[in-house]
């Protein structure tokens, strides 16, 4: 839809997604197949605390520069799995970077969410459904600087 709008600057379309939206962004930047190869492409992508597990199992690679921001203490999405996914794509992928915020949990960029234990999550790294979630001021500040810099490239 966006690519068909007359006001769109086609060379500047980027993807940005958080959590499940970040997973969707990572799926969307995989190599194109079939008729999709003829469509306009994205300039870049940013995925913030995405779960990389299923993508890692697919021999993921990106066709556009992709930035992943994730907390080192995230219990919903494993930073180690995202790093493994990106490392596995080296040599067959566009530039992909994972930036891990040590000690940061899921929702680290929320403007004002005290760190708290939440339960009932469908996905958690340990399978318990319990995760910590909340703002990490240093990670938030860095992400607010890092994302626009990435998108300007």
Roles of regions detected by a PLM:
Residues 78-89, 113:
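Short alpha-helix in the alpha/beta-hydrolase fold that links the catalytic acid
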Residues 95-153:
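C-terminal catalytic histidine-bearing segment of alpha/beta-hydrolase fold enzymes
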Residues 68-70:
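Short beta-strand/loop motif that positions the catalytic acidic residue
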Residues 1-63:
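Primarily recognizes the serine-hydrolase "nucleophile elbow" in alpha/beta-hydrolase
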Residues 73-77, 106-107:
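Acidic catalytic loop of the alpha/beta-hydrolase fold
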Residues 22-25, 82, 144:
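A general structural signal for well-ordered alpha-helical segments in protein cores
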